[in-house]
Amino acid sequence: MSLLKEAWPASRLVTMLDGGVQDTARQRLRSEWTKRLRATVAEPVYAELWMDIERVCKNSRETPWPELSFPLFQQFAHTGERKPYEDVYFEQRGRLAALVLAAVADSEPWRMKEVENGLLEICQEYTWALPAHVREEDTVTPPWQQVDLFASETAQMLAEILLLLGEELNGHVVAGVREEVERRVLEPVFWQPRHFEWETAEHNWAAVCASGCGIAALLLTEDSQGKAVAIEKMLGTLDYFLEGYGEDGGCPEGVGYWVYGFGYFIYFADMLRAFSGEAVNILTSEKIGEIAAFAERVHLSDGIFANYSDSSETERLPSGLVSNLNDLQGRRSALPFHVSGLLEDPCRRWAHVLRNLVWTNPLAFGSGEAAVDYLPQLGWMMCRSRSSSRSSSHSSSHGRAARTKAGSGAMLAFSAKGGHNNEPHNHNDLGHFILHGDGENLLCDLGAGLYTKAYFSPGRESIVNISSGGHSVPVVNGTMQQSGARAKAVVLDIAVDEQKEARTGTRLKLDLTSAYPAEELTVFTRSFAWTVLEGNEGARLTITDHFEFESSGVSMKPWDVEELLISRFQPRTGAGFVEWQGTKAAVRLDYDANMLRPRIEAVKHVDHDGVSFVFYKTSLKWCSDRKPH
């Protein structure tokens, strides 16, 4: 463990969080944020973000505040649907965020009035926790004191708004905000504490909740001793959060939850350092540096990621967070530069949008290069190679070959996943892989599905995003991969080029036998070999699946293996081949037509945001009788 709590006990913190230091930090931060926010209005790189802010402000003048009614709150319990309530909830937060930022830039009276209205609307909500996170069986803690991710975010948001605009807001509004943050968050977490599960969680909840509650305590608690006790407690929670990462810095929840959890960890660390007069720095360990590099390591090209677990392949990274991490690491990032608009984030997160404005440094960004990254504790491999001309890459499995064409200078990439099937936001995806061609995942991971009650309930493996049937892995004797830590990928062989360039010789071999409950299966290994072709004219991925089955006396028991390949691109078939054509690259799979016949299924589905799309499942089946299929 990092043991932040041991390094910074309350007895040590109390002298660093006295009133004088706090007042100085408050004045300096308010001045710096205000100055920087106003400067960004005229800077072209922020134009899209400010257009979103003005669009939301205009809408707020023309329409009333959306209502979070109690019947809407009850809808999750009755139907399992989360989205109807959450859409209104996040619209409220986004509207308030836009109004506050616009008011800081130009404090027109109507804007300040709308800010006050928004603050009062949020203070009157039944609970700040989402219905999906309210524990109805908890008879001790009422819903309005159940502190989840979004209650914590709300407390942080309101505290930071008071920091920025408190002197200009109506005193009754300020008092009401302080009272509600105290009653709904600070009291149940610190002063009359209940134990929340996130306090000892080893995933994003620990960091987000500790950050939100910790920043609210820093900004709103006046007693130095009480503040020190609160911060010590949150540092203990952050110790658990860091324990969820291996020494390789890999995030098993995927890059989206890395942004969420580690991003809020950084936001809290920065605020704690500022409000301790630069005395408390919790970002000094080597492990923090490894975690900070995670997004770069799983980035394939053009803002597209290896998106295992519940993450999107097109994750928009907060430019403020990435800029801050670049400063922490003392180098430019290989990630593409983009300042996200307010409306690009469905959750309209205040913490991200504020820091995108006050922290972003366009000079901190660069461009991706050919490289191999392997995260041994996480079990993920990423290989990136840049082609020099129109070329092809090949993949083979069971004698089949795939060919990918790509344009000159295109980034060709491959990623494979090991790990186990009991990870946070787990998908049953051991041995799954991604093939990437210049900004597109041609063979892909579907990422997160639409969050409902069923998505996090027993039997969730039937959902295609979670099932191994929605990944590029085989179905063995009609069985999918099983859930649980006993299903794990054991690394049998790994070779990565010493120069970390994606050259001949990069390979990974996994034993995946335990992933499948098929009784007849005694051995299943999958081997990947990524090769850059001579002259850097493309790359070849070779996949070899090796199966052994039980025999009955002198004969082997019947068996069958159905290989699956998942893509958002509709494949084209011909005599002995399947091809997936992207915008700049194409994957071609060649196979023995005497032995195999592909079956292609178009599957209608909805993504994490409820938007309909179609993906394509290609299957090729082998069986013990060796008859054509």
Predicted regions and their residues:
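CBM-like, beta-strand-rich accessory domains located in the C-terminal region of large
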Residues: H133-R135, V339-G341, R390-A401, K405, ...
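Structural helix-adjacent loops and short alpha-helical linkers that scaffold large soluble proteins
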Residues: A103-E116, I161-E182, A217-L235, L272-I288, ...
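Carbohydrate-active enzyme catalytic cores, enriched for enzymes
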Residues: F262-R390, S397-L442
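Active-site lining segments of carbohydrate-active enzymes
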Residues: D138-G256, Y267, L354-G366
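Solvent-exposed loop and edge beta-strand segments that line ligand/cofactor-binding
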Residues: G80-Q92, V104, R135-S152, W191-A207, ...
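Non-membrane alpha-helical segments in proteins
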Residues: F90-A105, N117-E121, S152-L164
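Extreme N-terminal leader/anchor segments
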Residues: M1-L49, A98-V104
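Long, well-ordered core segments of solenoidal/helical folds
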Residues: V56-L68, V115-H133, G176-F196, V229-G249, ...
